[in-house]
Amino acid sequence: MSVRELIIVGAGPSGLSAAIAAKKRGIDCQIVEQGVLVNSIYRFPPQMVFFTTPELLEIGGLPFVSPYDKPTRAEALRYYRKVADTFDLQIAFDERVLAVTRDEDERMFELETRSSKGVRRVRLARHVIFAIGYYDHPVRLGVPGEDLPHVSHYFGDSHLHYRQNVVVVGGGNSAAEAALLLHRSGAHVTLVHRHPTLKRTIKYWVRPDIENRIKEGSIAARFSTCVIEVRPTSVVVRQIPDEAAATDDEAARQRELFADADASRAPASALVAPGPSDGPAVNEVPADAVYLLTGYRADSDLLCRAGIRLNEREAPMLDPRTFETNVPGIFVAGGAIAGKDTGTIFIENGRFHGDRIIEAIAQRL
């Protein structure tokens, strides 16, 4: 069985960037990807627009040409296909890495993989880079009914839900954009968020839109509310005491903003930012479909099985200069570095990790 100098787990932008750097150095490299090219971007909603400019998504020095200030999902997919072809990168698709272990003499690593059709194989490499991102592993609520067929952690095409009751759980960009798209496609939308306010990180052009739709009652909103069960035709929710509202300026601003919402236009399920004086209440929200857009995490179990130590935030412990972990020869790049703090690593900064990793590997050869 042949031994590669380097295997990169993940064909996202950070993995592709590392592979390009390796190729420029003449380092034998293979990418193994459990899904398709840039799988996370592929799973974004079809109408998705990036929160950045094209040049900040570029890798390998290949220009990302777009007529727009902010590129679309379709443009990004086309660009990264061009990257893979231009640099003739070796990528094995539909291979999920199950485990990474050292062989007995510790001169190489064994990667056990399995395809969606159940085909298993073992690959050997002297160095491994985990560039697995985090979008493939949603943060689960752990409530009854979370696995029902009408429940998803990923938002797709809003047209499917014309005239349906749809519950969107979350308070960030994904939830806000999904709620708006659903509303404009004729769905009856209820937004459920466990905190008293929307997240501060919502895109600047999305925030006024979602706030105004809530204010006018077009989108029902339940702040300081958590999901306790998903049923076939409804979602059971419970209010959370809004203890932080008194000291949170943003919470106060949003309560004032939504206070005069036109109740006559809002669905019967609408409830906006309950205050601390309101007792906890449990009730049901009608739901033909449910989107749990509550965030994502890297596959920490896979990292741990490879012997990588994680800190209290589930981020891998590594050398900040080289991104090498406590396991010599294993590196981490891109979103997998972030642990629970997924808002710190993006394509814009993760695309540079590969250069530093490959520099460290090249010095050992």
Q: Each predicted region: which residue ranges?
A:
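Short hydrophobic core segments
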Residues: 7-9, 122-135, 167-169, 286-295
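Active-site acidic short loop of glycosyltransferases
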Residues: 3-4, 124-126, 163, 232, ...
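Glycine-rich nucleotide phosphate-binding loop and flanking beta-alpha elements
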Residues: 15, 38, 99, 135-137, ...
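Short glycine-/acidic-enriched loop or helix-start segments at secondary-structure transitions
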Residues: 18, 41, 102, 139-141, ...
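Rossmann-like dinucleotide/flavin-binding elements
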Residues: 2-3, 8-34, 154-201, 322-365
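Beta1-alpha1 glycine-rich phosphate/pyrophosphate-binding loop at the start
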Residues: 4, 11-89, 176-205, 311-312
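A Rossmann-like FAD-binding core segment of flavoenzymes
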Residues: 88-95, 99-101, 105-118, 122-125, ...
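FAD-site-proximal beta/loop scaffold in flavoenzymes
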Residues: 146-160, 263, 267-272, 278, ...
